Amino acid sequence: IRLTTKEKWLEEGRPEGTIPRTADMFRWPEGGGVLMLDYDPPPDGIPLNREDLVSALRRAVPGLCDAAMLWWPSASSFIINTETGQQVRGLRGQRLYILVANASDIPRAGKAFTEALWAAGSAYFAVSTSGSLLSRTIFDGSVWQTNRLDFAAGAACRAPLRQERGEPVLVPGA
């Protein structure tokens, strides 16, 4: 199946094998799934390391202390210049993946995580370019929408740049 914009999909007469990336075209399945947590530090901020990120999550949501999770740097992390050996970009964005028994519960869980992160002090307001206050937590709440994609494949780099994210790390539960 190919993804496209709704506008293009309608213009092309709703072609077979193509769907728009809109919420009404996707759903969370009943049964097992994967909850993805997307962490991007503020542009001018120092990113949390893996241990501090997991600790912040578990402090806010103690029920996750027993949950194993998979950690992996985002496509924005660990870019090096192979000619100089210089790290052009270190650890920035990160993902945590948690197996869930009922994926259709992900939106509700995401809302509960957001409330818990605010209560734990792991949230803030950002100011938009128009001056509006934007509610933010350490995890991007928009990823709990059905039509959000996880761009997990890594960065497409041209020589002499290369991404060296390593392998995903299994973070055990307590």
PLM regions: where:
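Signature for HUH/AEP ssDNA processing cores
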Residues: 1-94, 98-120
